[in-house]
């Protein structure tokens, strides 16, 4: 079996992948999407010996019938199921150790996260200081949006005509 340091690293990886993408997750249970991500990111699923379909089938095998998630023990069982398929020609124990080393200490990769483009054709579209017309009024000098105040003209339903300058002075005139 794997050494105690590998087991600690394996459990840490399980927790990191279990909470990935779900702010409410406790880290004790992993769903199928995160299991597939773990297998892909840690190169357990290589596309040849172990495919995405194999990963999904193993997940379905190890979880309880009505459950949608697996715990750490079921996670280790799933790795044991995939190990001989991933490392053909090795014994079950050697294959499990090898697959544990692939997973241990890894964390989810944020592949596909993009940054805002600056320059070229998109510069005038993303720089709020270059906006014209009514769109210019939607942002303050720093480029932060003003919210609803920038999108709508708020009506004054006080009863006065819009250009009237002495609104609210009638009571002062009558009392004198």
UniProtKB/Swiss-Prot annotation:
Gene Ontology BP annotations: decidualization; embryo implantation; microtubule bundle formation; microtubule polymerization; positive regulation of protein polymerization
Keywords, alphabetical: Acetylation, Cytoplasm, Cytoskeleton, Microtubule
Compartments in which it is found: Cytoplasm; Cytoplasm, Cytoskeleton
Organism ancestry: Eukaryota, Metazoa, Chordata, Craniata, Vertebrata
GO cellular component, one term: microtubule
Role, per record: Regulator of microtubule dynamic that has microtubule bundling activity. Required for embryo implantation; possibly by regulating beta-catenin. Also required for decidualization via regulation of beta-catenin.
N-acetylalanine modifications at: 2
Name under which the protein is recorded: Tubulin polymerization-promoting protein family member 3
Organism: Bos taurus
């Amino acid at each position: 079996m794997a050494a105690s340091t590998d087991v600690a690293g394996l459990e840490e990886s399980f927790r990191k992948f279990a909470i990935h993408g779900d702010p409410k997750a406790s880290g004790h249970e992993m769903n199928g999407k995160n299991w597939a991500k773990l297998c892909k990111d840690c190169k357990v699923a290589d596309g040849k010996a172990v495919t995405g379909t194999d990963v999904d089938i193993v997940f379905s095998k190890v979880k309880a019938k009505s459950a949608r998630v697996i715990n750490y023990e079921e996670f280790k069982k799933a790795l044991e199921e995939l190990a001989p398929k991933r490392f053909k020609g090795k014994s079950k124990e050697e294959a499990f150790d090898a697959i544990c080393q692939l997973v241990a200490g890894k964390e989810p990769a944020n592949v596909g996260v993009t940054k805002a483009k600056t320059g070229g054709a998109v510069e005038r579209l993303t720089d709020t200081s270059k906006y014209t017309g009514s769109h210019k009024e939607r942002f303050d000098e720093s480029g932060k949006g003003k919210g609803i105040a920038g999108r709508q003209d708020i009506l004054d339903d006080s009863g006065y005509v819009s250009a009237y300058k002495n609104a609210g002075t009638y009571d002062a005139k009558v009392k004198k």
